[in-house]
Amino acid sequence: MAERGSDIRPGYVLEHNNALYLVVKIMHTQPGKGGAYIQAEMKNLKTGAKQYERFRADGDIKRAILDEADYQYIYGDDSMLTVMHLGNYEQITIKKDILGDKSIYLKDNMVITLLSYNGEIISAKVPDYVTLQVIETEAVIKGQTVSSSSYKVAMLENNQRINVPTFIKSGDKIVVYTPDDSYYERAKE
């Protein structure tokens, strides 16, 4: 679908130079002389390579139309995942690296979204918010928040380390915001 360059947003998938690119970041620029343009950081969905591209704000871009379908994660190994379509219960096997570094969030029976283009699966997304248990945290020293940060490092059940507020203890369940791998809130019981 053709759109204007000024319509580009992070998360869009563009057809550019006979390949599909995911727009990661954008920056609108209005130089003193000449027309406005958009500087986009993009990721090639097939190779994973990063690329920077300029688009004229009034120029045309071609946005790819992707099909989204929800699948339930059943099981996996080091390189492959088996998932089941929630509508027709068809099971398929996909490469684990299609999730990239977000595969650490996979849990049994988790619903993930697979994105396909012309019948070929090109990308996958985990939910934006995932609840995980804290396995280990650093001890908090009384008065620590006065002189330093009010965050400490916690090890989660998926062996990931993230910064959490000092009131989080080992055994607590927290919600992690997966797009930037950050603490969101303490899980509600």
UniProtKB/Swiss-Prot annotation:
InterPro entries named among the record's database cross-references: Elong-fact-P_C, NA-bd_OB-fold, Rib_uL2_dom2, Transl_elong_fac_P/YeiP, Transl_elong_KOW-like, Transl_elong_P/YeiP_cen, Transl_elongation_fac_P, Translation_prot_SH3-like_sf
Record GO biological process: peptide biosynthetic process
Listed pathway(s): Protein biosynthesis; polypeptide chain elongation
Cellular compartments annotated: Cytoplasm
GO cellular component, one term: cytoplasm
SMART domains in the cross-refs: EFP, Elong-fact-P_C
Gene Ontology molecular function: any one: translation elongation factor activity
Keywords: Cytoplasm, Elongation factor, Protein biosynthesis
Function: Involved in peptide bond synthesis. Stimulates efficient translation and peptide-bond synthesis on native or reconstituted 70S ribosomes in vitro. Probably functions indirectly by altering the affinity of the ribosome for aminoacyl-tRNA, thus increasing their reactivity as acceptors for peptidyl transferase.
Family membership: Belongs to the elongation factor P family.
NCBIfam families from the UniProt entry: efp (TIGR00038), PRK00529.1 (NF001810)
Identification of the protein by name: Elongation factor P
Gene source species: Ehrlichia ruminantium (strain Gardel)
Originating gene: efp
